[in-house]
Curated annotation (Swiss-Prot):
Subcellular location field: Cytoplasm
HAMAP family: TrmFO (MF_01037)
Function of the protein: Catalyzes the folate-dependent formation of 5-methyl-uridine at position 54 (M-5-U54) in all tRNAs.
Record protein name field: Methylenetetrahydrofolate--tRNA-(uracil-5-)-methyltransferase TrmFO 1
Residues annotated for FAD binding in this entry: 9-14
Family affiliation: Belongs to the MnmG family. TrmFO subfamily.
Catalytic activity: uridine(54) in tRNA + (6R)-5,10-methylene-5,6,7,8-tetrahydrofolate + NADH + H(+) = 5-methyluridine(54) in tRNA + (6S)-5,6,7,8-tetrahydrofolate + NAD(+); uridine(54) in tRNA + (6R)-5,10-methylene-5,6,7,8-tetrahydrofolate + NADPH + H(+) = 5-methyluridine(54) in tRNA + (6S)-5,6,7,8-tetrahydrofolate + NADP(+)
Predominant subcellular localization, coarse grouping: cytoplasm
Any one of the GO BP annotations: tRNA methylation
A GO cellular component annotation in the UniProt record: cytosol
Pfam families: GIDA
Keywords: Cytoplasm, FAD, Flavoprotein, Methyltransferase, NAD, NADP, Transferase, tRNA processing
Enzyme class, first EC level, given as a word: transferase
Amino acid sequence: MNKKVKIIGAGLAGCEAAYFLANNDIQVELYEVKTLIKNEVQKTNNFAELVCSNTFRSQSLLNAAGILKAEMRRLNSLVIKIADSCKIDGDDALAVDREDFSKKLTDVIKNHPNITIIEQNVSYIDDENDLTLIATGPLTTNELKEDIQRLIGKQKLFFMDASAPIITKDSIDFNKVYYSGRHKQGKYICCPLNEQEFNKFVDDLVNAEQVQLKEFEKSIFFKGCQPIEQLAKTSKKLLLKGPMSPNNLLDQNNQQPYAVVQLRQDDAKDSLYNMVGFQTNLKWPEQKRVFQTIPGLEKAKIVRYGVMHKNYYINSPKILNFKLQVIRKKNVFFAGQITGVEGYIESASSGIWAAINILAFINNKKIKPLPNTTILGALTNYITNSKIYSLKPMKCNLGILEQENKYQSNDKFYSYNNSKNSLENYIEQLNKILRTNI
């Protein structure tokens, strides 16, 4: 097979993939449009621009973000290598000088002998002749978005304008909640509120501090999707007839509460639940404060906060296999936020994983999925698991890990050590199959 790969998008995922493949003697054509077409959030012409926060989150090996970065270091991540070199003070977080970070990373990519930079607005994917990785992120150009729709089907490309918080099941107080569901809805976890609790919740909600939307976002979101706090400001009745309706949600005593917050299972393992209809634009500390006033959620652990922003992503469980390869178009792979992962390190790490699978594809080698005991493996499984009915973008969290013996272990670093050992064993086998030296 021709050892040349087209990568569309020089963001975190695209640069990681290009770097990995180029270091394995694959010729890479890296396409980037930002010098030709500016989107609403870009500030410079450098690659992998950090347009939101300047932090890659915690370095602690007690949490998922720290463990994922450890996995990325072991996989020779360019993003983490550059981030380490640009670190600024930020407690235990890996915070960087964002301009220095993007400039250094761009220099590495542009000076790699196996990478050719092509400044072009790609509008057509030749899925028959070109081996292509699409890593265009949430702000994919309209022209390419239309061709992606041709490639995967018009109903398979989602526009996400809002999402609701996701919490862990084991943090719910089951002494205060019950299971119920309307008609053929299935069994949801129901958090009942009496009239006094409901009124206090609404007061807290409407007075909570919100994230300030950019001008280009304001025109997009409030047309088709009302955040929960906007509904509350409009009318309490909208909540009682909408996301907090108690109709046909009888409790254990066969009584109908004044209001109900429903929680819906969000993963195949039954460990994560999302707050139904609670799309929100509240600041994250405010989400925690306000939503923990709901009975049963006083100690709720939020693993993904509600967000509102422009974001294109594909319905990966229906389109991609575990290799991040289009099931019906074997020459096409996806990586980054367009796959449904959310966050800098999640996007970058998916680029590494896609590149590993592209290398295997080029060499006609079969490799197994990453173990679900690793953060990257569990996250990849989450976004490509065909059992998920409707994919919502996900940051890494410990709730998606496979860790059967965690609660029998006294090791507070159990998740990290389990991930480390699993990844080492996997890499040992991978190096033998692909004749690499990771």
